[in-house]
Amino acid sequence: MKYLIASDIHGSAYWTERLCAAIESEQPDRIVLLGDLLYHGPRNDLPCDYVPKRVIPLLNALADRIIAVRGNCDAEVDQMVLDFPVMADYATLFDETGRELFLTHGHVFGAGMHNSIDHAPALPEGSALVYGHTHIKVNEASEAHPGLWLFNPGSVSIPKDGAHSYGIYEGGAFSHVILEEE
């Protein structure tokens, strides 16, 4: 099974269109959205082409393949316009081997700017904590939580490490993919 993992769209129609083109090309079985879908938040500058009303139908067209969690910039009003559940703080997936993928935005569990999770939930050894929030790509073993893999796809629209990106999980491995400008 192939998962495309994206986070921190923040209402950018331009970058959502780029993401949709990537989804068309990648043909994932499921799309994981790690929160902060429509609103840019008070600490972020407006992303390129900030038009949440254009983002809504783009995401709704993919609703049957989306698994989403709530970000710190998501609100109940977002659920009124999105055709897939978006208000859960976390979700859990299991890959073909039984490996647990714990999906969360990250803010609830203390995602830090230095590739850390302050309050990781108790997970079986070999599990992966898949999170967003920091807008920085991560793909590494946790030093603070032995046996836990950390993966952050970075940000679709407001990267803090220079490159707009998403992630892929397939065959037990995570990877980052850079979204190119048109």
Placement of each model-derived feature along the sequence:
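Beta-strand-turn-beta hairpins that frame and shape the catalytic cleft
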Residues: 1-3, 92-102, 143-150, 171-175
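Core catalytic region of metal-dependent phosphoesterases/phosphodiesterases
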Residues: 2-95
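Active-site neighborhood of phospho(di)ester-bond hydrolases with catalytic His/Asp-centered motifs
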Residues: 5-7, 31-36, 66-72, 102-105, ...
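Active-site-proximal segments of metal-dependent phosphoesterases and phosphodiesterases across multiple
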Residues: 42-50, 82-123, 160-161
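Short, well-ordered coil/turn elements that cap or connect secondary structure elements
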Residues: 61-63, 88, 96-98, 124, ...
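Conserved beta-sheet core of the metallophosphoesterase superfamily
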Residues: 84, 107-181
